[in-house]
Regions:
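Structural detector of well-ordered beta-strand residues that form the stable sheet scaffold
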Residues: 53, 91, 115, 186-188, ...
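Glycine-rich phosphate/adenylate-binding loop and adjacent beta-alpha elements
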Residues: 3-4, 8-53
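Rossmann-fold dehydrogenase core element
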Residues: 186-188, 199-238
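Cofactor-binding loop segments of dinucleotide-utilizing enzymes, especially the Rossmann-like FAD-
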Residues: 95, 118-119, 192, 216, ...
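Mid-domain Rossmann-like dinucleotide-binding core that forms the NAD(H)/NADP(H) cofactor-binding site
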Residues: 57-143
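C-terminal hydrophobic helical "lid"/dimerization subdomain
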Residues: 143-144, 151, 155, 171-178, ...
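Glycine-rich cofactor phosphate-binding loops and adjacent beta1-alpha1 units
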Residues: 81-86, 108, 123-127, 131-210
Length: 271
């Protein structure tokens, strides 16, 4: 028992519960596991005895507080995992709530060049990316994205590539690899695709690429995200676009994928 508690203390109380093999996550833990209340679409939530809690800053609206997860991911992935900082050049693939949060995190960290890509369905979201601090936006359906990246970087490529797409398969990995600078870039990848036939391992090795996995965030990232959301430094209302009542959960989920103008949806439990 002492050994078990030592492991839990080191991983959870040490702020990085992502590495805990027995960790529970709302929205991911099966409802078959007692007490079966591992979702958040309700007026009340069940908190186990060792739940990790964060205090929402006074005055922060529920809608903006709801952006804390993508914002914490932005801080974790871009800053802590991939080392984005002063004078970094960054490629962000995907202008959804996650990609836009990455724009804010990178801008706040001092990145000198932020490039955001999207498809023809993302015209409005790419406009929002510009308003939040992106220097270059690329519609991959209308332009050659690699040529645009090389143009923006003077042929050097970017220091960091962040994959914030959904359902794009291996394309963001291949494009990110091509867009990275000649040597020593860092690439964040998603884990949607279980296998990757003909993975370009030689290219990864030759370019001395560091690969990081997008896997949630730690305690510190969440705390910093809440501070960022409460700072009023960015027009975050551009991300928190829509509100739905609890009875309209299905419509809310469908809305996110149906319209370019819907970015982050808030479910109001008492509405």
């Amino acid at each position: 028992m002492g050994s078990e508690m030592c492991i839990r203390d080191r991983l959870c109380m040490g702020t990085d519960w992502r590495k805990n093999p027995d960790g529970l996550r709302y929205g991911y833990t099966s409802a078959s596991r007692a007490p079966h209340l591992w979702g958040g679409f309700a007026e009340y939530m069940y908190l186990p005895w060792k739940a990790v809690l964060h205090k929402v800053p006074t005055g922060l609206s529920p809608e903006l507080a709801g952006i804390v997860t993508p914002m914490a991911n932005g801080i974790q992935w871009a800053l802590f995992d991939c080392g984005v900082g002063y004078n970094s050049s960054v490629l962000i693939q995907g202008p959804g709530q996650q990609g836009l949060s990455q724009v804010i995190a990178c801008k706040q960290a001092g990145a000198s060049l932020i490039i955001v890509t999207g498809t023809g369905k993302d015209v409005y979201r790419l406009e929002v990316a510009k308003k939040l601090g992106a220097d270059v936006v690329i519609n991959v359906d209308a332009e050659d994205p690699l040529a645009k990246v090389r143009e923006a970087t003077g042929g050097l490529g970017v220091d960091v590539s962040l994959d914030c797409t959904a359902g794009a398969g291996t394309i963001p990995v291949l494009f990110g690899l091509e867009a990275l600078r000649r040597k020593g870039g860092t690439m964040l990848i998603q884990g949607e695709t279980a296998t990757f036939p003909n993975f370009p391992l030689a290219q990864v090795a030759n370019k001395y690429v560091t690969i990081k996995a997008a896997r949630g965030h730690n305690y510190q990232s969440c705390e910093l995200a809440l501070q960022q959301l409460a700072s009023d430094r960015f027009a975050l209302d551009l991300i928190a676009t829509h509100r739905f009542g609890l009875k309209d959960v299905d419509a809310a989920i469908k809305a996110v994928g149906a319209s370019d103008g819907v970015i982050h949806v808030s479910l109001m439990p008492w509405q």
